[in-house]
Amino acid sequence: MAANLRNNAFLSSLMFLLLIGSSYAITSSEMSTICDKTLNPSFCLKFLNTKFASPNLQALAKTTLDSTQARATQTLKKLQSIIDGGVDPRSKLAYRSCVDEYESAIGNLEEAFEHLASGDGMGMNMKVSAALDGADTCLDDVKRLRSVDSSVVNNSKTIKNLCGIALVISNMLPRN
């Protein structure tokens, strides 16, 4: 009898947790709403649909920040490789500026994680916005070059798109 009561209590608790968890899940309609607010809705929908199965908003923010930081780190390594490989002085100056921007962007993304963890959507928003500015500044710097590494341009555009998604999500999070 006691075992039966424990099973019932366990099942009741499990059902309660499932109901609570599902009430915070992001629906495909909400994903569309998020993506409609970005500068590149088609990129956003493709990204969210391939990465997520109805996460909650904080999980969605974390995974988006994870992807953004991974891409920024990859871009930073590529930039350092280009500089180390030898380029003309003008290109070296532009790529060096990009390295500085990406070092700063990665730092801003690390702080965005901290704000997310503490439930501070506004703080996350400010740090993601700063990271987006870094990618944008790098794009401006390299567009002036005669010969540009396409992976730097493509990665910077992807980072801008990912930051756009994170910014929309941050606006949906609580403000501290």
Swiss-Prot record:
Q: At which residues is glycosylation annotated?
A: N154
The GO terms describing molecular function are: pectinesterase inhibitor activity
Q: Where in the cell is it found?
A: Secreted, Extracellular space, Apoplast
Any one GO biological process: pollen tube growth
Question: Which tissues does it occur in?
Answer: Highest expression in flowers. Expressed exclusively at the pollen tube tip.
Q: Name one GO cellular component term.
A: apoplast
Task: Write down the superkingdom of origin.
Answer: Eukaryota
Keywords, alphabetical: Apoplast, Disulfide bond, Glycoprotein, Secreted, Signal
Checking InterPro entries in the record gives: Invertase/methylesterase_inhib, PCW_Enzyme_Inhibitor, Pectinesterase_inhib_dom, PMEI_plant
Q: Which SUPFAM superfamilies match?
A: Plant invertase/pectin methylesterase inhibitor
Gene3D superfamilies listed in its UniProt record: Invertase/pectin methylesterase inhibitor family protein (1.20.140.40)
Disulphide connectivity of cysteines: C35-C44, C98-C138
* Signal peptide location: 1-25
| Quaternary state and interactors | Monomer and homodimer. Interacts in vitro with PPME1.
The UniProt comment on domains reads: The N-terminal alpha-hairpin extension is required for pectinmethylesterase inhibitor activity.
NCBIfam families with a match to the protein in the record: PME_inhib
Summary of the function given for this chain in its UniProt record: Inhibits pectin methylesterase (PME) from flowers and siliques. Inhibits PME from leaves.
Cross-referenced PANTHER family:
PECTINESTERASE INHIBITOR 1 (PTHR36710:SF22), PECTINESTERASE INHIBITOR-LIKE (PTHR36710)
Q: Which protein family is named in the record? A: Belongs to the PMEI family.
| Name used for this protein in its record | Pectinesterase inhibitor 1
| Protein species of origin | Arabidopsis thaliana
> What gene name is given for the protein in this entry?
PMEI1
